[in-house]
Amino acid sequence: MVKVGIIGGSGLEDPNILLDPVTVAVDTPYGKPSDDVVEGTINGVECVLLARHGRKHDIMPGNVNFRANLWALYSRGVDVIIASTACGSLQENVEPGHLLFPDSVFDRTTGRQSTFFDGSYDQAPGVCHIQAHPTYNEKLRQVLISTAERCQLVHHRTGFGVCIEGPRFSTKAESMVFKSWGASLVNMTMMPECILAKELGIPYATTALVTDYDCWKEEDHVTASSVMKVFAANVEKAKTLFVEAVGEIGKIDWSAEILKLKTEARESVMISPDVVIPFLTTDNQKKF
């Protein structure tokens, strides 16, 4: 049976979406994750929930230990990961309250630890030149999209986000430039989470919860308070989406997909093929 990792952004760290939740403290070779994980089931499917910013939301985007977060989920045996993330809209038709399922991202962050293969852990040797396209797992993305359609949630099937360092919002000049690039979203946490999942060979997809129009739109300047008002309503939509999507994910055999991703990740590491990287081995591959 598949085990699903859920990375909850602001407001979506509620353990009550799980049946029989159990809190588990986790340490990793890359330090402590943002918080303890919470394990339980949704629709009979095992799940592991992690609050990206901590359950008190006291970790700013640039200080999130993304490597520890992803490793914590890997160490608890998750097979796929779905995530949520609050975003500002850069396009008129992507309205606050809508959901969007990104298919790519433009990285504007600075200084974040974006790879497991930096020499700090002996079981992650070499240098990993992971392919960043496709950024998100298409099979998992399609599960989220079809679930949103079935739940009649207003959503957009494609679009890319610009991930900024934060914690400040964009200047108007930045917002206008991002908009001119054709980006749909601006956000602070889309990177490097998706890339780290690829390095682990774990299917990963995110759901963008649109909260505002950033500052490119004269009459709708973004503020923290305005974001949270819309986000509260979006959280309920995301909970509905994730509860239903987990049930669908549990019906799918992910063996071939995971084998493909782990093989691609291992082939991306510049080191002798004779060197064993434990978390990318495909021997004794889990059967669903």
Swiss-Prot record:
Gene3D superfamilies: Nucleoside phosphorylase domain (3.40.50.1580). GO terms for biological process: L-methionine salvage from methylthioadenosine; purine ribonucleoside salvage. It is found in: Cytoplasm; Nucleus. Substrate binds at M188, D212, Y213, D214. Belongs to the PNP/MTAP phosphorylase family. MTAP subfamily. It comes from the Eukaryota. It comes from Caenorhabditis elegans. This is S-methyl-5'-thioadenosine phosphorylase. Phosphate binds at S10, R52, H53, T85, A86, T189. Its EC number is 2.4.2.28. Catalyzes the reversible phosphorylation of S-methyl-5'-thioadenosine (MTA) to adenine and 5-methylthioribose-1-phosphate. Involved in the breakdown of MTA, a major by-product of polyamine biosynthesis. Responsible for the first step in the methionine salvage pathway after MTA has been generated from S-adenosylmethionine. Has broad substrate specificity with 6-aminopurine nucleosides as preferred substrates. The keyword Ribonucleoprotein does not apply.
